[in-house]
Amino acid sequence: MNKVTTKTLFEKKQKGEKITMLTAYDYTFAKLFDSCMVDILLVGDSLGMVILGYDSTIPVTMEDMEHHVKAVARGTKYSMVVADMPFLSYHTTPEEAVRNAGRLIRAGAYAVKIEGCDDVIDKIEAVIKAQIPVMGHLGLTPQSVNVFGGYDLRAKEEKEAKKLIEDAKKLEEVGVFAIVLEKVPAMVAKQVQESVKVPIIGIGAGPYCDGQVLVCYDMLGMYEDFKPKFVKRYAEVGSIIKDAVSKYIDEVKRGEFPGKEHSY
């Protein structure tokens, strides 16, 4: 079982094989997903919401990301580990972007993911020149939520769609190995996918992308605060956990647990 690399992903796109990607934030989930042979595990700054309880990804720090990257990396043998670069970790200077990207690689990530294009393309290029693989992220970029005023659909208008395609080409030119495309119309995503050679991984971007990514807590039914239209719940693990905990509480209160089989 060979570990997934950037070459693996390029070959999948060329062969028309879909790429699978999920978020992971700890050793236990990473080990489970890795055993299922998920291609990419994203240590997303979404941990700010689903793990740390923030309202957005903006408060997440480099220290938060390093901590969770280390845990996920310990649980993977097959999956590529990609780490989000958090808010303000790459926005100031190319030098700081390289230093922070390096911290995440040393923590165990194979690559980093950076949101945006024009405002940060010099930073993306610097990180790639430092021999660190970069995954791009276009469309809805959650770290810019305060600028855009919400999590609305992007690239609805023709002008914005054309800009999205241009941005994808720019990112490809500077050397990103893949691009996440978030919350854009399916036909726009199809145009982007056909315009570049690098894999396009969609989240709320329709079926024409080269792969798909979801937040694991969303697709497992564990995060009830927010459920976007693009999320499919493959299980209701939250309900299973609640039922199990309620049963445990009941058995402890009634003196049924621990029984003889659980005692020494």
From Swiss-Prot:
Its main location: cytoplasm. This is 3-methyl-2-oxobutanoate hydroxymethyltransferase. The active site is at 182 (proton acceptor). Homodecamer; pentamer of dimers. One of its GO terms (molecular function) is 3-methyl-2-oxobutanoate hydroxymethyltransferase activity. The keyword Protein transport does not apply. Keywords: Cytoplasm, Magnesium, Metal-binding, Pantothenate biosynthesis, Transferase. 3-methyl-2-oxobutanoate binds at residues 45-46, 84, 113. Pathway: Cofactor biosynthesis; (R)-pantothenate biosynthesis; (R)-pantoate from 3-methyl-2-oxobutanoate: step 1/2. Pfam families: Pantoate_transf. The lineage of its organism: Bacteria, Bacillati, Bacillota, Bacillota incertae sedis, Caldicellulosiruptorales. It comes from the Bacteria. Binds 1 Mg(2+) ion per subunit. Mg(2+) binds at residues 45, 84, 115. Belongs to the PanB family. GO terms for biological process: pantothenate biosynthetic process. It is found in: Cytoplasm.
